[in-house]
């Protein structure tokens, strides 16, 4: 019996329910793409009230990528005109170190202006709780 796997899903909506099927909160990668002028873009979790915001203006074609490094530090890069730069300094000082909590996370891509030109994509790996055999030795 063959079972298919869902690798991605595209929806046009102001609210996006991202379901974390795992047992633990997990970091995620978000890409904010601009199809026009977008002022102070942000991602908001309507369930928890947390947000990650930026004090910047995105131009058409710009991409902000928010992710965690291999040492679990928050990182941000801006790709503008084909040039990639470190954009950590653009973070709004009131931003939260957001994770996707187990269950439903209702996220929105928001902006002070130009929100209709902002497109967000979210990716993550769910985590399960367990004990590794080598830990029990």
Predicted features, each with a name:
Residues 2-137:
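Intrinsically disordered, low-complexity segments enriched in serine, threonine, and glycine
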């Amino acid at each position: 019996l063959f079972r298919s796997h869902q690798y991605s899903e595209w929806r046009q909506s102001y609210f996006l329910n991202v379901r974390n099927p795992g047992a633990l909160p997990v970091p995620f990668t978000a890409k904010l793409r601009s199809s026009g002028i977008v002022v102070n873009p942000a991602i908001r979790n309507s369930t928890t009230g947390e947000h990650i915001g930026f004090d910047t203006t995105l131009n058409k074609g710009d991409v902000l990528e928010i992710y965690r490094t291999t040492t679990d530090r928050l990182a941000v890069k801006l790709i503008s005109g084909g040039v990639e730069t470190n954009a950590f300094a653009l973070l709004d000082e009131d931003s939260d170190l957001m994770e996707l909590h187990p269950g439903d996370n209702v996220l929105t891509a928001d902006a002070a202006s130009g929100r209709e030109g902002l497109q967000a994509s979210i990716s993550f790996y769910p985590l399960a709780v367990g004990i590794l055999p080598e830990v029990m030795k």
